[in-house]
Design a protein with these regions (language model features):
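Domain-level signal for soluble alpha/beta catalytic cores
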Residues: 2-508, 514-848
Length: 848
């Protein structure tokens, strides 16, 4: 395992000084079998047999007590422990069994030199224990930075921040962890792994969602529940976000997908300012009605978030007193996810895995991987996504490159341009673990086989990281020639996976296709094996279809015929070339015949206006070679690649590397203004519309903006600087007292890519500093961000100063706690619910 240690060391995966250095899974397979340290009462909670009552908001109580939370409220545990303990006691007295200590932002990045993480956690947990609560929960919130590839913080840096908190909390005597208010699924994963790998305390994990029912990165409650359940948290749920009534549909979605108990800690509605104080719209009686409905549906852990106080918690404690939770028996979902897209299977459903990011037999891809040309690989990912694949295979298996490092890079890059789940394809467990560790979502590993060495190496990785896994029907003796032999190997793999607690819904058996040209008799055996595996083992199947035609002419015809036969035998996930029209037709038709395409709506939409000759012609024209530069169009697209040399497609799909050539060709016949106003701007408008409709999420939005910027840069370089002169300047800041800057940083990146000059003043910014920037740079538009209700006053003060000293300046505001009503109350001109809205405001105010 020295290779893995070297990779982790070279890529920064070494914990902070004094921490516990992470042991690779393969050196300690038992680490995948997590045993939780807790008492029997908590064990009953984790089994879903007992209710558990958390406390409510800390910030709300600090405000009511008249305490100034300041920029680092966690420091109050050191400077004013009596008041913090007093707040905990108030919650305990009304029925809170768990107090959440005041450590939400107590990570090294936020604390800086103000205090050590260990000291803050020790003081906070001492306050919690002094309250007499049954359990003390160590609170772990977001780092305040956006993780790569969208942001700048490496996964391992986030992991180290969380690991330091975990070790400090465990050493100080915490009873459990509550990882909360997470909006980035990858950041949540880093925190969960830090907790799993550095402690054996129970892990409660909750995410926060917007009004559209997704996080700002596009994660739905269903996906969150699937991924967190697979990662092995003990309780999952939702906190903050919205009021309890607004959360009900999201909680219902989680309850249907979560295999562990579900918790809810809602806000007391939306905040507003009355007489200079923050008040919330939902009173305790209305709050408890919504919570009661969620409890009746299956929620078993309750508490409160922003705006709640002991009055709310008292009603929750009374609600569940003397009751047992609703019995829930949720089968694990069968399928895989990215952060924003789930490919799930039920009944006879089928899903396709795009095969084109695999260097075997592909000279161009091999050359691209050797040269580090990831743009070519991203083109393949986008092409397959547009063509309708349900997942993408990613393989970097070349002996002359660093496979682990390349695979890690590919995973991050591909997840930035494609929403599809990925199949991590490698025979090297080191590379597999490196890639799945930084994957956002639930991937599938390809593969494990029947050799004991392989089982011992790969299955612990699949369990620890919550992955599905492909099992190859081969062992030390090779590939059995008969269906019975293949089945025997598959059975061994499934039984070994059972020992690790890997559910059968996460196991996909590959019965291994042999070439009909050399192993003709085995083709029928493969089909028999698929049926046996499905019927006797209760697992799904996967198959690399194109191998069957090796050595034969007109390979696509052979592959297509075999694909149809395999579907009939029970194949669930074929690995194929999605650019082939013939394959797509077979998949679309099978989905009608097996009932997956209800009422044949998808089939009718795709083929109603096509003649048989047109379909046959398309099938004949498509080959298994395909073309990454000329992908099949996605449904509903009307790209005219001839008229604009692919420019609109490249912007919409975020293909930054393709932009220089497309723009240069357009400039041969168009002037710069025509390229901008006739092509680039409409393409960005298209992207914005897709974002508003929920078809695109933040990663796609940012990738498209970067592609557009690449186009603007070419115009500048070729003498069109006048046409792309600075579109205007905007100053942005996180207001005084608030040290959270994820949202602000996203706005900065987007606006810069749209061509605006952005003066980013940082976080915890004094009102005077904003005014100084406005005066120095003649700023006409200012953007302000706040995450916490306790810091909205800083936003109001900044706007008041600007109104007095620079009345012509327009102000837009945003942030987790900000609403349109709030924006109006603090005197802002515009409310921006997301980064895309800020780009619209810039266009309106700055006229560009």
């Amino acid at each position: 395992m020295e290779a893995l240690r070297s990779f982790l060391r070279d890529n920064g995966r070494i914990h902070f000084e004094g921490g516990r250095v992470m042991t690779p899974i393969n050196d300690n397979p038992t680490r995948a079998m997590r045993v939780v340290r807790c008492d029997e009462t908590m064990a009953a909670v984790l089994r879903g047999e007992r209710f558990l009552v958390f406390d409510g908001a800390m910030g709300t109580m600090l405000q009511q007590a008249g305490l100034e939370a300041g920029e680092l409220p966690e420091l109050l545990c050191l400077t004013n422990p009596e008041e913090i303990t007093g707040i905990h006691i108030q919650y305990v007295e009304v029925g809170s069994e768990v107090v959440t200590v005041n450590t939400f932002g107590a990570n090294r990045r936020k604390l800086g030199d103000a205090a050590s993480v260990a000291d803050v956690f020790a003081a906070a947990i001492a306050c919690g224990k002094a309250s007499g609560a049954k359990y003390v929960a160590a609170d772990i919130g977001p780092t305040g930075a956006l993780l790569e590839p969208l942001g700048t913080m490496p996964f391992d840096e986030a992991y180290e921040l969380f690991a330091e908190q975990v070790c400090a909390a465990d050493a100080a005597g915490a009873d459990l962890f509550i990882i909360e208010t997470m909006a980035d699924l990858l950041e949540m994963k880093a925190a969960i792994l830090a907790a799993k790998e550095n402690s054996d305390l129970p892990i409660f994990a909750t995410m926060t969602f917007g009004e559209d029912g997704r996080t700002f990165l596009g994660t739905s409650p269903q996906i969150a529940a699937i991924v967190l359940s697979s990662l092995g948290v003990d309780v999952l749920g939702v906190n903050c976000s919205l009021g309890p009534n607004d959360l009900r549909p999201m909680v219902s979605e989680m309850l249907k997908a979560s295999t562990v108990p579900v918790m809810v800690q809602a806000n007391a509605g939306l905040p507003s300012i009355v007489d200079g104080k923050t008040v919330f719209s939902v009173a305790p009686d209305e709050y408890i009605e919504a919570v009661a409905a969620m409890v009746d549906e299956g929620v078993s852990v309750v508490g409160g978030c922003c705006g709640t106080n002991p009055d709310y918690i008292a009603k929750e404690a009374a609600l569940v007193a003397g009751r047992a939770p609703v019995e829930r028996d949720v089968a694990p979902a069968c399928g895989i996810t990215s952060a924003s897209h789930a490919t799930l299977l039920a009944g006879r459903d089928v899903a396709t895995i795009g095969e084109r990011i695999n260097p075997t037999g592909k000279k161009k891809l091999k050359a691209a991987l050797r040269e580090g040309n990831l743009d070519y690989v991203l083109g393949e990912a986008i092409s397959q996504t547009e063509a309708g694949a349900d997942a993408l295979d990613v393989n970097a298996g070349l002996p002359e490159i660093d496979e682990a490092a390349t695979l890690v890079s590919l995973v991050g890059k591909i997840q930035g341009v494609s929403p599809l789940p990925l199949q991590i394809d490698s025979s090297d467990p080191v590379a597999v673990e490196a890639a799945v560790r930084v994957y956002s979502g639930k991937p599938i590993i390809n593969s494990v086989n029947g050799k004991q060495e392989s089982l011992d190496a790969v299955l612990p990785i699949a369990k620890h990281y919550g992955c599905a896994v492909v099992g190859l029907a081969l062992d030390e003796r090779g590939i059995p020639p008969t269906a019975e032999g293949r089945f025997a190997v598959a059975q061994r793999i499934v039984e070994e996976a059972d020992k690790y607690g890997i559910p059968r819904s996460d196991i996909f058996i590959d019965c291994l296709v042999m070439a009909a040209s050399t192993n003709q008799a085995e083709v029928v055996e493969i089909l028999r094996a698929i049926t046996m595996v499905k019927e006797r083992l209760g697992v799904r199947t996967v198959l690399g279809v194109s191998n069957v035609s090796f050595g034969l002419p007109l390979r696509e015809i052979v592959n297509a015929t075999f694909l149809a036969a395999a579907f009939s035998a029970g194949l669930d996930m074929p690995i194929l070339n999605p650019l082939s029209a013939r394959y797509r037709e077979i998949v679309d038709t099978w989905r009608v015949l097996c009932g997956q395409d209800v009422s044949a709506q998808g089939y009718i939409s795709e083929y109603a206006n096509k003649s048989m000759s047109a379909v046959a012609g398309a099938a004949g024209a498509a080959t298994v070679q395909g073309s990454a530069s000329a992908p099949a169009p996605a449904a509903g697209d009307a790209f005219d690649d001839v008229a604009d040399f692919g420019l609109r497609r490249f912007v919409v799909t975020g293909r930054k590397a393709n932009m220089p050539e497309a723009v240069s060709k357009l400039l041969e016949t168009c002037d710069a203004m025509e390229v901008i106003n006739g092509h680039l701007i409409p393409a960005l408008d298209d992207v914005g519309e897709r974002f508003e409709k929920g078809k695109f999420f933040l990663p796609q939005l940012m990738a498209s903006a970067e592609a557009a910027k690449a186009g603007f840069d070419v115009i500048k370089e070729q003498g069109g600087s006048g046409a792309v002169a600075d579109k205007g300047s905007v100053a942005i800041a996180t207001v005084k007292g608030d040290i959270h800057d994820i949202g602000k940083n996203i706005v900065r990146m987007l606006l810069e890519n749209y061509g605006y000059t952005v003066y980013d003043l940082g976080r915890d910014v004094e009102p005077q500093a904003v005014l100084d920037c406005v005066r120095e740079h003649d700023i006409k538009l200012v953007g302000l961000s706040a995450l916490m209700t306790t810091t909205v006053r800083g936003m109001e003060d900044t706007i008041a100063l600007l109104r007095e000293q620079a009345p012509d300046v327009k102000v837009f505001v945003g942030g987790a706690v900000i609403t349109a009503e709030y924006a109006e109350m603090v005197g802002a001109d515009y409310y921006c619910k997301d980064a895309a809205e800020s780009a619209k405001v810039c266009g309106e105010v700055l006229g560009a």
